[in-house]
Structure formats: C-alpha cells, structure tokens
C-alpha cells in the first residue's frame, strides 16, 4: 500500500510540474492556408509539379514535435490552396479571423502558413489591418513537405519561436523563412525557385534566428497594425484594383479594358522610376476622368517613385506594385480623395 501511495504521489507531481511548464509557455494558434509548405509530391526528389495545399495543419505540426517545447500550439485549417488562388475576399476573412483570435486573452500570437507566391500580399494586408500588437508571423516554404531536406519544418519551428517571443510584440506582421525575419512592409519574393528568395534589399531584415536565439536588429517607422487607420472587421468586400504593366509598345486599350470592368483603382508597374509612355499617359488620364485612382509604381523591384507633376497619377513611394495594390484597395475603403490617398502611401 505504501508503495502504491508513493507511485501515486510521483504521478501527481509529474502532472503538476507538466501543467506548470505548459502554463509558462506562450499560446500560439497556427492558421494553415495551404501552399508549398503543405505540398506533397510522388518522390522525395520532386520539387516541381507537386500538389500545393495537400497536407492538413495537424500533419504539419506533428512533423515538428519540437514546436510543443516552444509554445502551446493549436492548429486551425483556415483554407488549403495554392497561394496563386488566394483572393482578396479570402485574405479579408483571414484578417478578420486573426483579429478575433488576438482579441482573446488566451492567445499570445498567431502563425499563418501560406504559399510563397503571394505571401507578401497577404502579409502586408494584415500588416495594415490587424488591430493588435501581438505577434503575427507568416511562414512558407520553397520545397514541398515530402521533399528531401524540405525547408518547411524548420521555417515553421522558427516562426513559432518568433511568435512566442516577447520581443516580437509591436513589430507589425512578419514573414519568417530561412533564419530571417522580414517585415511585411518590405519583404518580397526575388527568385522563382531558390530557398533564399525572400529579401528586403533596400531596407534590410528585422532580424535573424541563429542557434535557437532571435536577434532583432531593426524596427520600421512606417505605420502599421494598431496605428493603422484601416479597419476591415466589418467589411464584406474590397474595391477592385488592377495592376497594369509598362513596357515598349504598351497599349492604351489596357486602360479601356480596366475601366470597362469597373475597377476603382489602377496600379501602374512602370519602367524605371515610374516612367509612362504617351499611350500610358492617355490611358491614365482617361481612367482618372472616370474617377479611377491611378498609382505609379516601378517594375524594377527596388527604389522610390518620386512625384512628377508632368505625369498623371499618384506615386507609390517605395511600395512595389503588389504591395501598392493592397494599400490602394484599403485606401479606397475610406476615401477617393487623391491628396489623402497620396499621404497614405507616404505613411504606410
């Protein structure tokens, strides 16, 4: 009988200490949306032609049991698609769900698994619309989960580490891949295939993860999250904004088509510092006469588009075309005043 009581006492102590340790860990929700990180292929050497969004969130979490030493994790399957199929309506609902989660006292941060092709767009949308300073971290992968040396598991582990760290609060939405922590405002995909594809060439990264430790190096001055004026919690749809590309012989009829399809805004991915051909100028002016807001950006990948009174439209500041489209959609939910919208682009 005495031995039985001793065994029971040890068992009770074990559960008490286990529960105590779990209570000290941050509570992180992992929202899965699909992408290559949840991709599956026929063989371990196949890194193209795989099916994105084939695996569920529980499979992703169970593949990295170490995450449970970093946080109390809970998985939620929000969607399961290749990110080229992500739409504004889905991202709007994603932002609303994240806001719901972060409003809870029992949630300390959110990790979102996503495809690499459009992760910068989704991340920037949430960067402008999440109303909390709790960490929100997007994570992705360039190789499917079934690949030899898949990058997804380590990326997921590091994303949970970042989301659970108190230093991560108030930094806006972040994107974590390959040991680097990028701001959603600046990060962009720069290579179609290589692992080290996400960069912020001009501005640099927020930090890095080395040897299981987070080293933050920068903060951004641009407004975001709790300091953003954009609130989508009650929205059901977003204004339609298209991107038109500038190139030799770019035709005016592209603007005609956009106008006919009822766009509210056009982002021009221009040559150089937002240069526009005579055909593009004619198209822009025609669109602006119809009340369409036009933003000039650059197709170069880096640099600021400065104001030019001789050219029509507003300027994107340092936002690339994909990011500029996100900001213009949100701006149009509040105003169509060009002066106010231009100030948004210099502020966010």
Swiss-Prot record:
Record keywords: Hydrolase, Pharmaceutical, Signal
A Gene Ontology BP annotation from the UniProt entry: asparagine metabolic process
PROSITE patterns: ASN_GLN_ASE_1 (PS00144), ASN_GLN_ASE_2 (PS00917), ASN_GLN_ASE_3 (PS51732)
Keyword Signal applies: yes
List of residues binding substrate: 83, 116-117
Extent of the signal sequence: 1-21
Annotated phenotype, changing residue 288 to L: In strain: NCPPB 1125
Top-level EC class as recorded in UniProt: hydrolase
Known outcome of mutating residue 295 to M: In strain: NCPPB 1125
Gene3D superfamilies per the UniProt record, alphabetical: 3.40.50.40, L-asparaginase, N-terminal domain
Sequence similarity: Belongs to the asparaginase 1 family.
Other comments on record: The sequence of strain NCPPB 1066 is shown.
Name of the protein in question: L-asparaginase
The species this protein was found in: Dickeya chrysanthemi (Pectobacterium chrysanthemi)
Designated gene of the protein: ansB
